[in-house]
Amino acid sequence: MTPVRRRKLFILLFALSVLSAAAALVLYALRQNISLFYTPTQIVAGEAPAKHHIRVGGMVEANSIVRAKKGLDVQFKITDFENTIVVTYSGILPDLFREGQGIVAEGEVTDNHHFHATQVLAKHDANYMPPQVKSALADKVKQ
């Protein structure tokens, strides 16, 4: 192999290794920031990872909202009409949050029936429902 070819091969291998390392770092960084979506049924079945930041969506169950006498703590249940989980949240709830409302909560699973939310998102108007919640609920109605 001539010195010119050897040098080109070395440069090519070096460039490929740098690109591979950069791609690996990007994928690692993206993995840290991904919030996967789960339904209450998937959480009850144990499919959701514990102690990882995820999203859960469903409908707020009737007569399930319990507010603390002092502070901003609130506890409520969300359902996908098959299973129900208890969500605890400390903070100000959105103005549109109410019973029978479709919501998405971000936070961590504490066990198979409890979820600690760090953020609660409610739908915007009477016709809007988060796409993940809509498809998950549609799947339950079909069954």
Curated annotation (Swiss-Prot):
Residue ranges annotated as Periplasmic topological domain: 30-143
Topological relation to the membrane, as annotated: Single-pass type II membrane protein
Molecular function in Gene Ontology: heme binding; metal ion binding
GO CC terms in record: plasma membrane
Ranges annotated as spanning the membrane: 9-29
Pfam annotation, one family: CcmE
Binding locations of heme: H124, Y128
Superkingdom to which the source organism belongs: Bacteria
GO biological process, one term: cytochrome complex assembly
Protein keywords: Cell inner membrane, Cell membrane, Cytochrome c-type biogenesis, Heme, Iron, Membrane, Metal-binding, Signal-anchor, Transmembrane, Transmembrane helix
Locations listed in the record: Cell inner membrane
Cytoplasmic side stretches: 1-8
Entry keyword Transmembrane helix: yes
Family recorded in the similarity comment: Belongs to the CcmE/CycJ family.
Alphabetized PANTHER family for the sequence: CYTOCHROME C-TYPE BIOGENESIS PROTEIN CCME HOMOLOG, MITOCHONDRIAL (PTHR34128:SF2)
Function description: Heme chaperone required for the biogenesis of c-type cytochromes. Transiently binds heme delivered by CcmC and transfers the heme to apo-cytochromes in a process facilitated by CcmF and CcmH.
Protein name: Cytochrome c-type biogenesis protein CcmE
